[in-house]
């Protein structure tokens, strides 16, 4: 089973992580594989909450840069995260993992409202909690939502699953000389403008001394490895 190093974690997935190789929408095989892996993490005894982006369906920032009202675009992005959250709930429950979706925007027919104490009770009972609709406010990314929810539920760490195996000095797919950083401080991330999380999310983690681990979600077994304390990817923390 493995023994969890982190008792309570918040896993942040990009919307693209659900799209698989097609690059958009939701790929059933990909989401089923992620659900099966999360089931293994739950079996270790670790408590896991999820925040999923919406970029596989709609990108608010991209739409606003082309003339759409930023607040409207961001609300559309929040709805995209709810589509992903419901899809992930379905995939998790199909593999036998009790899952609750909590939305920052009221939509009582499809999800619980976000209530911090209720979310913590769900986690204590061994359920997965998926936080949808970001923070419920425009101008805030799902990275910031992940940082905020992680603080609120008392998570030990944020795990950011991406398509690369850590943080690099440049895009490793475009620049063969890019260097991978095994460890970084929050200030290094902010000063170098590294694509870990946006500055608001990183600053929030820094102020509350919450570690961030960036790792490759596309390799099966990596979520469990990180939760059990194996050093893969890049860890971002204080001095």
From Swiss-Prot:
Its main location: cytoplasm. Transmembrane segments: none annotated. Pathway: Pyrimidine metabolism; CTP biosynthesis via de novo pathway; UDP from UMP (UMPK route): step 1/1. It catalyses: UMP + ATP = UDP + ADP. GO terms for molecular function: ATP binding; UMP kinase activity. It holds the Pfam family AA_kinase. InterPro entries: AceGlu_kinase-like_sf, Asp/Glu/Uridylate_kinase, Uridylate_kinase, Uridylate_kinase_bac. Allosterically activated by GTP. Inhibited by UTP. GO terms for cellular component: cytosol. Keywords: Allosteric enzyme, ATP-binding, Cytoplasm, Kinase, Nucleotide-binding, Pyrimidine biosynthesis, Transferase. It is found in: Cytoplasm. Its EC number is 2.7.4.22. UMP binds at residues 54, 74, 135-142. ATP binds at residues 12-15, 55, 59, 162, 168, 171. NCBIfam families: pyrH_bact. Homohexamer. Belongs to the UMP kinase family. HAMAP family: PyrH_B. This is Uridylate kinase. It comes from Geobacter sulfurreducens (strain ATCC 51573 / DSM 12127 / PCA).
């Amino acid at each position: 089973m493995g023994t969890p190093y982190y008792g309570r974690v918040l896993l942040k997935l990009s919307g693209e992580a659900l799209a698989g190789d097609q690059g958009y929408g939701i790929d059933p095989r990909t989401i089923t594989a992620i659900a099966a892996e999360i089931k293994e993490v739950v079996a270790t005894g670790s408590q896991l909450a999820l925040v999923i982006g919406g970029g596989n369906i709609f990108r608010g920032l991209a739409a606003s840069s082309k003339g759409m009202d930023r607040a409207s675009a961001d609300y559309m992005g929040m709805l995209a995260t709810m589509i992903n959250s419901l899809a992930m709930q379905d995939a998790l429950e199909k593999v036998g993992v009790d899952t609750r979706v909590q939305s920052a925007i009221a939509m009582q027919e499809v999800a619980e409202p976000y209530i911090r104490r209720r979310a913590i009770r769900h986690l204590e009972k061994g359920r997965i909690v998926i936080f949808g609709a970001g923070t419920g406010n425009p101008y805030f990314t799902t990275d910031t939502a992940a940082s905020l929810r992680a603080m609120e539920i008392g998570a030990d760490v944020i795990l950011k699953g991406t398509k690369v195996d850590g943080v690099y000095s440049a895009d490793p797919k475009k620049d063969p000389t890019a260097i991978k950083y095994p460890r970084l401080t929050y200030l290094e991330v902010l000063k170098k403008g590294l694509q870990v999380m946006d500055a608001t999310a990183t600053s929030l983690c820094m102020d509350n001394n919450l570690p961030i681990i960036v790792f490759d979600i596309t390799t099966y077994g990596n979520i469990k490895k990180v939760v059990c304390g194996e050093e893969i990817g890049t860890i971002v923390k204080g001095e």
